[in-house]
Amino acid sequence: MDIKNKVALITGGASGLGFASAQKLIAAGAKIMVMDLNEDNAKKACSELNGEADYAIANVAEEASVQDAINKTMDKFGRIDIVLNCAGIGSASKTVGKDGAHPLDYFKIVLDVNLVGTFNVLRLAAVEMGKNEPEKDNECGVIINTASVA
């Protein structure tokens, strides 16, 4: 895929792997929508990116929040060509600690962001990507999912 003038939606794009990816993609000529939960960090990331970038505040685990971010991307850039899922959280708790078992609610939050959130973004973005005119290799876009222990 030729990156020049492509639109990339990057979850967790205000820091870490997401921000580093945004820097590489924008250097290759892409337009970037930073999707992040933290508005201050997202603003700062966009100001540091040397190119066409904007941000959308969203919780990847919430359908309406993600749809709003996708709508903002479509309004701003008219398309989505690349989705890069980098949003993720971790829990710094032992499975069994001094106070007993790791709270299950903490683990459910991690799953909501890291698993449900990733699927939520890709399924909603894929709807818009499917509307793209296929390129010479019949490609309408690419979705990249990452995983880590945050």
What would you call each of these model-derived segments?
Residues I3-I32:
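Canonical Rossmann dinucleotide-binding motif of NAD(H)/NADP(H)-dependent dehydrogenases/reductases
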Residues A28-K44:
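Conserved glycine-rich Rossmann-like NAD(P)H-binding loop of the short-chain dehydrogenase/reductase
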Residues C86-K94:
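Conserved NAD(P)H cofactor-binding loop of Rossmann-fold oxidoreductase domains
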Residues V113-D137:
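Amphipathic alpha-helical dimer-interface segment in Rossmann-like NAD(P)H-dependent oxidoreductases
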